[in-house]
Amino acid sequence: QTLKEHPEMSSMKETAERFFDVCDTGKGWDACQQFCHADASFSAQAGALADVNTLQEYADWMKGLLTPVPDGQCEVRSFAVDEDRNNVTAYAVFRGTHTGEGGPVPPTGKQIEADYVYVMQFEGPKISHLTKIWNDGISLQQLGWA
C-alpha cells in the first residue's frame, strides 16, 4: 500500500509533521491549534507534566521550555503512520543547554539530550490527543534541575 493509494495517510502524516515542527520549535498553541481539535487532550507519565492535560497547555509548555533552554532543538529519528489505529508516532531527541533565565534554578550551563516519543491520535483530519513518552527524571538531572 502506498500513500497514493491512501491519501488519508499522506494527510495525517503531513498534519503530524507540521504540528511537530511548530510545537517542538516553541511556537505555542497559536501556531499549533490549526492542526488540532480545540479540545485536544494530552497525557504523559512524567511528573514534570503532571498538571498538563490539554494539547493547548502542552504546546505552551514547550514554548516556555525554550526560555531557559533557548538553543533547544529536536532531531526527528522516526516518523510512522498507523492507518489502522488512526495515529502517527514520532521519535525524536531534544538537545539544548540551560543558559536562559526562567527555569526552576538560575542557569546551570548544563546540557540535555532527551529521547521522547509522541503518539498523535487523529479524529478526522486533526489531532484529538497526544501522548508523550519521556523520562523526565533523567532530563531534569541532566539540566541540574533535580
PLM regions: where:
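C-terminal and inter-domain tail/linker signature
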Residues: 2-146
